[in-house]
């Protein structure tokens, strides 16, 4: 990926070397090679990073899920709106949906069902209660949505009003998708974006190295720690 720094490149190459039965190169060597060829990324010098006071990440899978949404602009002026659900331990994008309209309460409820079925199969109710963290968007705080969440075993939790950064893990996912996939892909219209979105999410889940996961992808982390 053209947006990967040397540590993520090293993680990818190490994964490939081990699959081929070869000794992986040292990360310092990767740094030197990338520097020699002008491939190192510039240090981020943007605005002040917003921080949250609470800890979003958890140590066990299926304890807390977070959800949020974002927009993707197209060259022709169309906009694609995406909503997603992440596990706050392994960072897997368990479910997502995209529309050219607004994200509705019905959409969020579909998102919940898709996440539950991805992790537990077709069940009427989760075997354990899982927190569902979101902001205070109308589609999330609607009475029907909160009631439905509890009916299937999710416990709705919302970030403090005017503090969306408290859902920092979801924000980090949005930044990753926009930086590593959206900005380097063709976006002539909504149809093209929506056609590419599943492959972006699949690559994120299967390949994208996370610093918090020891530079493993979500699926690598899941495989190493079991699927339960």
What do the predicted segments below correspond to?
Residues 1-228:
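Charged DNA-binding/catalytic regions of mobile-element recombinases
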């Amino acid at each position: 990926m053209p947006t990967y720094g040397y540590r993520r490149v090293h993680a990818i190459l190490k994964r490939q070397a081990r699959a081929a039965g070869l000794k992986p190169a040292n990360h310092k060597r990767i740094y030197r090679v990338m520097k020699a060829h002008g491939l190192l990324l510039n240090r981020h010098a943007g605005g002040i990073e917003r921080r949250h006071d609470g800890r979003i990440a958890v140590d066990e899978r299926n304890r807390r899920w977070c959800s949020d949404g974002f927009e993707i602009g197209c060259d022709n002026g169309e906009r694609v709106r995406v909503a997603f659900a992440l596990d706050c331990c392994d960072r897997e994008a368990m479910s997502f949906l995209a529309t050219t309209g607004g994200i509705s309460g019905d959409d969020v409820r579909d998102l919940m069902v898709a996440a539950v079925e991805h992790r537990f199969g077709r069940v009427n109710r989760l075997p354990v209660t899982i927190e569902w963290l979101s902001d205070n968007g109308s589609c999330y705080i609607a009475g029907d949505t909160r009631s439905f969440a509890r009916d299937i075993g999710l416990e709705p939790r919302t970030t403090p009003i005017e503090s969306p950064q408290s859902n920092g893990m979801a924000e980090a996912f949005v930044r990753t998708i926009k930086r590593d996939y959206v900005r380097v892909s063709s976006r002539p219209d909504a149809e093209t974006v929506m056609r590419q979105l599943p492959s972006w999410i699949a690559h994120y889940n299967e390949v994208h190295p996370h610093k918090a996961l020891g530079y493993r992808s979500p699926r690598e982390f899941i495989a190493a720690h079991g699927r339960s």
